[in-house]
């Protein structure tokens, strides 16, 4: 069946925290172009965007300053590539059945995003 791609990082206790591939937009880059680049940089998979999954918008504190962050999420389909962690920040990458994605995700905001996204099999 259809699968979803997650990246994993090991925490201090050795547990794997699974999350959606993500990264920062570079100067002059669209959110879509950044997403395609980050997926390939983190996982080795070349993909194409099939639809937007929405935006997570939030504030957090860092070094005593309030930081505003906007995260764009997209649904992809795989084009080519060999699945393997490509950068040091990613410890492991793996495919999961689509109906397991939400429960595998370590972060509540990503779980909510997937829950709101409807049928991931539909472009």
Task: Please annotate each region the language model reported.
Residues 112-120:
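A small-molecule sensor/coupling module
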Residues 123:
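Catalytic cores of nucleic-acid ligases and guanylyltransferases
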Residues 9, 44, 115-116:
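A ubiquitous, low-specificity "background" feature that marks scattered single residues
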Residues 1-20:
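N-terminal strand-loop-strand
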């Amino acid at each position: 069946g259809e699968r979803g791609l997650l990246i994993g990082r090991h925490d201090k206790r050795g547990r794997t925290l699974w999350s959606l591939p993500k990264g920062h937009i570079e100067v002059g880059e669209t959110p879509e172009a950044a997403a395609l680049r980050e997926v390939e940089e983190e996982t080795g998979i070349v993909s194409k965007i099939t639809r937007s999954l929405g935006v997570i918008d939030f504030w957090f504190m860092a070094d005593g300053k309030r930081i505003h962050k906007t995260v764009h999420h997209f649904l992809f389909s795989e084009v080519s590539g060999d699945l393997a962690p490509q950068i040091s920040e990613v410890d492991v990458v793996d495919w999961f059945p689509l109906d397991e994605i939400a429960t595998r995700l370590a972060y509540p905001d990503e779980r909510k995003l997937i829950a709101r996204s409807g049928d991931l099999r539909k472009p």
